[in-house]
């Protein structure tokens, strides 16, 4: 769990997120949800499919739980506090609890994340609350309590 507290990577990602919000063509997170995401549900599972146009840079939320990632199309640069890599479709991997990603689409990219959804929640705002935290202080509290999965 100590590796989760990588302050250099955290500060880079937060700084990028802050700068992106000031750009004239910046898309607010809530609007991006409407434009670029599809949501799929199966018993006990939630899948989010995101379409990311070439040249778009996105900083995501902090995920509380480990989850599956699938790049089905394209090539994308991904930076987290755990590592930095370029992924080319087809690519499948598992994200660690506590992951916050900054991504840059090198080509048009389609990305799916698959999350446990044991209560079969279908309300997207409720799922966001279940699966993510809004800041690193909240994440650190979960780490200290041993509540990351």
Q: Where in this protein do the model-derived segments appear?
A:
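A short, N-terminal "cap"/entry segment at the start of jelly-roll beta-barrel domains
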Residues: 1-49, 81, 139-149
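Conserved short histidine dyad/triad with adjacent acidic residue
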Residues: 46-64
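Short histidine-centered beta-strand/loop micro-motifs
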Residues: 58-63, 80, 103-104
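Glycine- and acidic-residue-biased ligand/ion/polar-headgroup-sensing regions
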Residues: 63-82
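Structural motif
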Residues: 75, 100, 108-110
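Short acidic-glycine-tyrosine-enriched beta hairpin
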Residues: 80-101
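Double-stranded beta-helix
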Residues: 106-149
